Regions:
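Short beta-strand elements
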Residues: 180-181
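N-terminal lobe of the biotin/lipoate ligase/transferase fold
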Residues: 5-8, 12-13, 17-151, 155, ...
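Catalytic palm active-site di-aspartate
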Residues: 159-172, 177
């Protein structure tokens, strides 16, 4: 069990030797686990890691990413979010975040498709369940989202601009696209 800050907590009832075997198995799978005398084991996320616990730890929002579905690889985070959206709201609440390291059949506007290899992009879809919003009002969400993403990129030093209608670019390179369905 990985606790706060990446420190490993041995579950109750698991012997120290059982915990050591688990650490060895995780290291063999490529996880960077550091032994710290008298403290325990610390799981160090790889650079540019997209781990739900890392995302949740750095978010200040109250409702975004209370549930995070993470995939090493998927066809489309959007397709998964749409399927979750058809479920009961208690199973997939407003703000559910779907993220992946790799995507084989991403979709954009006008049914454009694209592939993203591991490490090429941040791939995510956010499930929103707006209350009392007419379909024609929902289109405003694209512009509001574009403004928010653009401002976030600028706060990190990127000279981000909105390329109408749904892309964020910086220095001529696309940073992200926003798809609302």
């Amino acid at each position: 069990v990985v606790g706060a800050g990446g420190w490993w907590d041995r579950p109750r009832g698991v012997a120290v030797t059982g915990g050591w075997r688990t650490v060895c198995a995780l290291r063999a799978d490529g996880y960077n686990i550091v032994s710290v005398p008298r403290r325990g084991y610390h799981l160090k996320p790889p650079e540019n890691a997209v781990w739900p616990s890392c995302i949740r730890a750095h978010l200040k929002a109250k409702w975004i990413a209370q549930r995070i579905d993470y995939y090493d690889a998927t066809g489309s985070t959007n397709r998964i979010a749409r399927a979750l959206g058809s479920e009961d709201a208690s199973a997939a609440p407003h703000g559910t975040l779907v993220i992946a390291d790799e995507q084989e059949s991403g979709r954009g506007r006008m049914t454009r498709s694209w592939i993203s290899k591991k490490g090429d992009a941040v791939l995510m879809s956010l499930l929103l369940r707006p209350q009392n919003t007419a379909p024609d009002e929902a289109a405003v969400l694209v512009q509001v989202t574009a403004l928010a993403v653009c401002e976030a990129c600028r706060s990190l030093g990127a000279p981000a601009l909105i390329k109408w209608p749904n892309d964020i670019v910086a220095d001529g390179l696309k940073l992200c696209g926003i798809l609302l369905e």
